[in-house]
């Protein structure tokens, strides 16, 4: 492949794993270069402002982890959200062209499968029988917390055994 350079990459169209979404759903398409701060700013503004009751974070390839991170941060900041997660593989098509045209090499097309994730966060209850369903957890401020998880513990001095 040292005699080729990448000319482009196209994600082949695939049906949405969540076709039954309400029309007012905010769809956040996370890319590898997306800034989490910008994504969260818009999603939290709409959820907390009441203009959106559903938010979908979707990402594929290297952005899949970033999409999950965004959804987890939103769940911490907005308690009581129901979650539905769908995983799939999407097909991408990469085009490669020869670096020098006089080598007699042909252009290449490479198809690959990349992981993709869709995370739906909703203020309204979702179908608990659907795969990937997660009910809202208890707000983090309620309930007793174990002493071991309350932050760093003071260091104990080692006992001097010289005497």
From Swiss-Prot:
Top-level taxon of origin: Eukaryota
Bias (Basic residues): 154-163
A single GO molecular function term of this UniProt record: RNA binding
One biological process term in Gene Ontology: tRNA 5'-leader removal
Cellular component aspect of the GO annotation: nucleus; ribonuclease MRP complex
Subcellular location: Nucleus
Alphabetical list of Pfam families matching this protein: Alba
Keyword field: Nucleus
Region entry Disordered, spans: 1-22, 129-163
InterPro entries referenced in this protein's UniProt entry, alphabetically: Alba-like_dom_sf, Alba-like_NAB, DNA/RNA-bd_Alba-like
Family in the record: Belongs to the histone-like Alba family.
Physiological role: May be a component of ribonuclease P or MRP.
Name this polypeptide is given: Ribonuclease P protein subunit p25-like protein
Organism: Bos taurus
Gene designation: RPP25L
């Amino acid at each position: 492949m040292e005699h080729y350079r990448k000319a482009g990459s196209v994600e082949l169209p695939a049906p949405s794993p969540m076709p039954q979404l309400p029309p007012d759903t905010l769809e956040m398409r996370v890319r590898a270069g997306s800034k989490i701060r910008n994504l969260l700013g818009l999603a939290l503004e709409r959820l907390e402002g009441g203009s959106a009751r559903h938010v979908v974070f979707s990402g594929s390839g290297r952005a899949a982890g970033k999409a999950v991170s965004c959804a987890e941060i939103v769940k911490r900041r907005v308690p009581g959200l129901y979650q539905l997660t769908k995983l799939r593989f999407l097909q991408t098509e990469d085009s490669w062209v020869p670096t020098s045209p006089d080598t007699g090499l042909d252009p290449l097309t490479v198809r690959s499968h990349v992981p993709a994730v869709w995370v739906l966060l909703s203020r309204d209850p979702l179908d608990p029988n659907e795969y990937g369903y997660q009910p809202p957890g208890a707000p983090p401020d309620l309930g007793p917390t174990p002493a071991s998880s309350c932050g760093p513990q003071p260091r104990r001095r080692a006992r001097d055994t010289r005497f």
